């Protein structure tokens, strides 16, 4: 269905083909047997998070292993935090001691995981530990420190809810801002980025907050159905007595006002994120950082003033995601600024004049547009500016590809 939607956007369709979109149709396979520990880690990464695996595998070899292990370690920690079947008094000591297990050969955890992939990770965590211990002291120190701090933060918020905006910032710092801080230190330790990244904790934190707040906003329905609340009470309580009310159509207007309020808050991190990315030098690191950030502002644009957030799943089209990846891989920071401008500009034109947050929302969006124009030296116009295509050829390719997929199935291109 996703490729059919993209037929109306030939630029997206070509990008889908270029980045090998047919992988998304392949079922998740079982892990291969008799793998070395490092190979096992990469197999699990590819199986559990194809999008993250995609950007990791594009990195320099000196950086790739460290970030793969960093991801799996934090995924293991998250598996313990998220398992709602385990009593809190049982879970907390496992969380807070998890980082020490990184220095214990053979360390693994049983009794956690909401699905087979999560169970596979923590029950075979000794394989991750083995590769971790071979990374070198610099990387190990960073990963251990971030894991310890994140575990303590998770433990804190397992015992209380998010009420105020400062608490929302703190929660997002623990679960995502610390990831940004760790990544910056890893970038510097690899020698691929400057010393500035070793101490850029605030900027790195805001990169993480921008991503995490976007996820929390988008995932309203999934979280509320699981009896989880990550929207800060001080915000939603201005619009309703009970957060779950927003699922009912009669509360649509206050629901949208609350949604737009939180999106406006998330947008406050965008300028710092753009400044952070402007300091990156390595092309693969730029791609690694820029793709998720552009996806985030694209997702905020899709969610803004959209009541579907409260009734279903809102996300940018698969073809549009492919176009973002293709554009950034082709043009790096130039495409990043262009895309940020486009999404900010589109969102600004959707702001309802009577929305309570309208003035602040427009201020944030105009600031993003202004900075992007300054960085580029020109004002972008349309998505099709990113990559020059022969549109007759693209349309012909799209139609031909759709025919082949309809005739031979979605994995046709992966067989070529």
Swiss-Prot record:
Q: Which Gene3D superfamilies match?
A: Farnesyl Diphosphate Synthase (1.10.600.10)
* Compartments it resides in: Endoplasmic reticulum membrane
Pathway, per UniProt? Answer: Terpene metabolism; lanosterol biosynthesis; lanosterol from farnesyl diphosphate: step 1/3
What UniProt keywords are attached to this protein's entry?
Answer: Cholesterol biosynthesis, Cholesterol metabolism, Endoplasmic reticulum, Isoprene biosynthesis, Lipid biosynthesis, Lipid metabolism, Magnesium, Membrane, Multifunctional enzyme, NADP, Steroid biosynthesis, Steroid metabolism, Sterol biosynthesis, Sterol metabolism, Transferase, Transmembrane, Transmembrane helix
TM spans (from-to): 285-304, 386-406
Give the record's family classification.
Belongs to the phytoene/squalene synthase family.
Q: What is this protein called?
A: Squalene synthase
Organism, by scientific name, is Dictyostelium discoideum
Q: Which gene encodes it?
A: fdfT
